[in-house]
UniProtKB/Swiss-Prot annotation:
It comes from Escherichia coli (strain K12). The keyword Membrane applies. The keyword Signal applies. A lipid is attached at C19 (S-diacylglycerol cysteine). It is a lipid-anchor. A lipid is attached at C19 (N-palmitoyl cysteine). It comes from the Bacteria. This is Uncharacterized lipoprotein YdeK. Keywords: Cell membrane, Lipoprotein, Membrane, Palmitate, Signal.
Amino acid sequence: MNRIYRVIWNCTLQVFQACSELTRRAGKTSTVNLRKSSGLTTKFSRLTLGVLLALSGSASGASLEVDNDQITNIDTDVAYDAYLVGWYGTGVLNILAGGNASLTTITTSVIGANEDSEGTVNVLGGTWRLYDSGNNARPLNVGQSGTGTLNIKQKGHVDGGYLRLGSSTGGVGTVNVEGEDSVLTTELFEIGSYGTGSLNITDKGYVTSSIVAILGYQAGSNGQVVVEKGGEWLIKNNDSSIEFQIGNQGTGEATIREGGLVTAENTIIGGNATGIGTLNVQDQDSVITVRRLYNGYFGNGTVNISNNGLINNKEYSLVGVQDGSHGVVNVTDKGHWNFLGTGEAFRYIYIGDAGDGELNVSSEGKVDSGIITAGMKETGTGNITVKDKNSVITNLGTNLGYDGHGEMNISNQGLVVSNGGSSLGYGETGVGNVSITTGGMWEVNKNVYTTIGVAGVGNLNISDGGKFVSQNITFLGDKASGIGTLNLMDATSSFDTVGINVGNFGSGIVNVSNGATLNSTGYGFIGGNASGKGIVNISTDSLWNLKTSSTNAQLLQVGVLGTGELNITTGGIVKARDTQIALNDKSKGDVRVDGQNSLLETFNMYVGTSGTGTLTLTNNGTLNVEGGEVYLGVFEPAVGTLNIGAAHGEAAADAGFITNATKVEFGLGEGVFVFNHTNNSDAGYQVDMLITGDDKDGKVIHDAGHTVFNAGNTYSGKTLVNDGLLTIASHTADGVTGMGSSEVTIANPGTLDILASTNSAGDYTLTNALKGDGLMRVQLSSSDKMFGFTHATGTEFAGVAQLKDSTFTLERDNTAALTHAMLQSDSENTTSVKVGEQSIGGLAMNGGTIIFDTDIPAATLAEGYISVDTLVVGAGDYTWKGRNYQVNGTGDVLIDVPKPWNDPMANNPLTTLNLLEHDDSHVGVQLVKAQTVIGSGGSLTLRDLQGDEVEADKTLHIAQNGTVVAEGDYGFRLTTAPGNGLYVNYGLKALNIHGGQKLTLAEHGGAYGATADMSAKIGGEGDLAINTVRQVSLSNGQNDYQGATYVQMGTLRTDADGALGNTRELNISNAAIVDLNGSTQTVETFTGQMGSTVLFKEGALTVNKGGISQGELTGGGNLNVTGGTLAIEGLNARYNALTSISPNAEVSLDNTQGLGRGNIANDGLLTLKNVTGELRNSISGKGIVSATARTDVELDGDNSRFVGQFNIDTGSALSVNEQKNLGDASVINNGLLTISTERSWAMTHSISGSGDVTKLGTGILTLNNDSAAYQGTTDIVGGEIAFGSDSAINMASQHINIHNSGVMSGNVTTAGDMNVMPGGGTACR
């Protein structure tokens, strides 16, 4: 916009014209004809003026000259060519009452023409008419290059044409219009043209300007106007394009105060780039009425409305119009900015149109307008501030960031009332931010929308008691490119709207935290349309309430047509009438209720109405279903997923809860109910509601935790037990299994428990199809309750069926169901084997009872027998389909034993065989055929059909080397000796070793397998010796002998847990071997002689009273020392088991590889005796590591979990390289501790004692009072020891040596001498 006027002579019209380019918002350019003097020089001569007049086309007439201290009074009618007052000197012209001065030509009149001149014209009741004889207005320069003053008082009247105050650089012009009926009329009025101009209208004085009024016309000029005390300035005629300019290129200021009045058309403040304009409207009854207000057009403009001042705007206002401009409006102290127009088109305000704009309303200021937009164009930046009680903006809509950047801050009980649609971030480039704080409020009334992020970016932040209230809908992220964010930040803040749509077509985010409240009692939509994405986070005791007493929808919909996400965390609460997740077929919705006291409360819950919906209840979050019904996958093609804990495939999490629900129903789509939680307690996670729905695609997925189904569920589809434990506690005799009619798959890590807790009187028949290779456990209310399968179960289950309290018949459908499965018979289970071959995957005995339909004597094969791939009849672990199971190898086998039956073997047991073969002799009827056999069967008890044990019928004394050392019980028993199944045989059942005697087991030359195994139970108080050239095994887990176990030669293998009974000592001779074979054994004391070997093979050995190991320990597993001292001598390089040292127990080492590469869990005492080298084991626990007997060891393991204590005795040394080598342990140092570190290390450990500390390496070691408590010598050989505290560290070391390249720094008080060697030093850090 060009506000530089060019004055030209129009020969046709015979007038001067002032031409300017007035750019309108509609893009038009207009020219205003203004009469203007050509006298632009700073100093004039009469010749120059005459030339100018000649050039103007008029004959020069007589001019009135008042100069050289003249005073001229006019009180009659006069006419002059020009009035020249104060040409070079001082002149005063008084036009008194009765005086009527006029012009005869077109000459310019001047008051204060040249430098140092001073002219004054006083119009005191007279009239001065500056029009020529043709009634053409003529120029008047007041303060051309000198000082000029025009005073209009006492009803004086001046009819001016083109009036310029300070018309040239250095000129100072002043016009004072004072008193009622004192009048100045102008056409074009410049106040500060090139110099300085002042206009004062006071005491009801009256001024008019009919073409343009300018304050501060040219750069460097200054124009000041004061309208006060009833004074009035009228800047207008019938042409609405007339302009009032404050600071065109110079500086202008207009002040309206004490009842002053100004009426103007278009008002421009800070018109050009160098222009600075200020408009002040202050005091009661002070008013300016304008048509359009441009504040900061190209330059800088400021409007101050204060102390009840009033601006009336007939049409719109722009603040910060063009790029680079700056406009400010301050409405304060009950000031009022009022827009008079009717309709939105003529009442709007742009704060930051293309430039920078500010609107500040405070101290009961008031703005009444149409739509207010902050940041209109892309380059525009607008800031609105409303603060203080009774400070109010009332408008027809508020837009922040239309295409530019808009900000609004409402605080300290300030109020914005928008009676029309409002937006933040309207266009794609628009950014709108609103902050409502400290009791501020924004009200959006009537049936209009509020949109946060229409196509741009919008942010609404509410905190410290801020409030937002809307009587209609609020959108966040309306169009595809829109991004809207709402932040509610504390308990005193609230957001009230009829409805909220978060992510309509764009992206919306709502964060409600710290006890804040969001009310949307009509509805809440998250992800409204296809491209929409919405996220709502309700956290930290905050509330989103969609419920009222009215009959409105009160719906919460997450993923309407787009993508929605609702996170309720850390005590957040959401309340709705009905909640729907993923309404339409392409929508996606996710709801997460996470944390204690986090709550989603709804009447009914729909997860996956037609789209893909997920509800996750985790970490004690709660879903309260007041209507009782939860629907998953309501219509096709919906997928509705309800997660308890975590989603399928994720890491398990603490479970959430569902209250007041009566059912979870799978709909016509795909319903998925996932249990993936961390509740592994015996009580488990209780599910009381009914799971129902005839959905072939429905799924119950169990991934982790222990879950209990208590209802008689009727759902179809699938039950997938992938991991964890699913307990079915409800069943009926008519086939209601608690898993409906679903197909059940138990994956390898998964476990399905079938209990009878809700129906103690009934049997249980599994009518479900069963697949997978995991574990199914059955425990009914008592052992006499029948468990069985049906034909529907199929033959695909390949896992383990672990039967506890139950009765089971192995025939027909039951046998078929276990075709590929392992049958594990536990205590209180009775399984009857019917006639014929019953072929199943495997049989494992764990305390149960198997009844065979056969008798003895009989044929070699029972009438009813079992065929298996794997038979497990020994104590210990077995592996089935890659999963490990633990059994005790015990149980009862019932057969028909005639009474009496006289067996000739009972009179003469075969005793000519090796003792190790006595348990396997006289093999009779085969009960089980097996491809693979684990265990000897020696722990099984043979009983008759009445349950009575088939007792030994012969006891023999067993003598060795002429001395009776034991007694042997012989009779019918069970054996796997042939290696292909389970048999009834007649042989040795038990051995009882006499106290004080030793029973030696040695296989017959070359014997192996069953012929070198003792499966009979070994008891008694005597000792057991193994003396073999090859190997002897013990396979009875019921052994309970108390004497010592001597492995004198060869190998002892333990094939069952507890095979060593209650032995008081395990003593292994030179070259002898003990093979734990993965089993668990306990001994009182342990003696491993030089040259002996213990093969752990992932087994466990517990030593209760210590001992000594001089041989080799090898393999992985566990060595548990629970008491006494176990001395381990020598190295065990192939040992990698975990060594656990209990409190009150000790392990001592004389070699750094005494415990190989295994970890050490030390809660007792680990003693290093005369050990040198690198200790690479990782140590954990809270015990003690003691370095004694001139030990010198470098700790290289990761000991970060060790919180115990390192003790260094006098003459011993420990060294470390990294912080993890010391863990979090303390150090009692009476020897030498060497710390070699290349990195900085802030040591927080306690180091005490009388020993020395040596610092090596280039790193910085920082000590505190605890780590500097040792009293010995400190040698800083390399790097730096620093003392890292603001207060001085008390270093107890008695002597400090700082070697070459060593440094000591920090704030420290030393207890002894300090020796700084050449190259060493100290420093202040």
